[in-house]
């Protein structure tokens, strides 16, 4: 449903992307990749499989893409913990990474999420400030446009 809601904003074809490698998880086993891909394609959707664990790599492989992400992923995108090897450049590792994503013509559509206190949180409900030069890279899916109280992991577990 998030992809459907975001497709109205980006006004172009949308695809699922799955990476066989992930910063926080082990390499995705072949059988799990096939299972997830089959679930997506059985509903008439297209999927792109990459070996790009971070959005810096994804933006290089898929220049011009608008990545549709959930709030939890947005928080991780802004976390310097995920960029230990991106120290070159004149800014913080996060800003250097956003620079590369921006240079590749990419952006993000971000869906909000309900927190532990049952409050819906979106782009404007975070404790950090996105540098002004990057703000136009982010578009928010409002609560009215899309709301799911389940994480992507919970959704995957329900469909097993």
What are these model-derived regions, one by one?
Residues 1-160:
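Nucleotidyltransferase catalytic core that binds NTPs
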């Amino acid at each position: 449903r998030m992809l459907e809601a975001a497709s109205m904003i980006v006004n172009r074809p949308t695809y699922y992307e799955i990476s066989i490698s992930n910063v926080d998880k082990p390499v995705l086993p072949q059988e799990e990749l096939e299972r997830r891909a089959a679930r997506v394609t059985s509903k008439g959707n297209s999927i792109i499989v990459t070996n790009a664990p971070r959005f810096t790599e994804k933006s290089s492989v898929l220049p011009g893409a608008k990545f549709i992400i959930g709030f939890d992923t947005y928080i991780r995108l802004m976390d310097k913990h995920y960029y230990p090897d991106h120290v070159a450049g004149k800014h913080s590792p996060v800003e250097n990474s956003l620079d590369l994503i921006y240079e590749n013509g990419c952006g993000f559509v971000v869906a909000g999420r309900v927190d532990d206190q049952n409050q819906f949180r979106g782009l404007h409900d975070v404790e950090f400030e996105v540098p002004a030069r990057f703000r136009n890279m982010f578009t928010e899916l409002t609560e009215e446009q899309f709301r799911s109280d389940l994480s992507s992991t919970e959704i995957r577990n329900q469909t097993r």
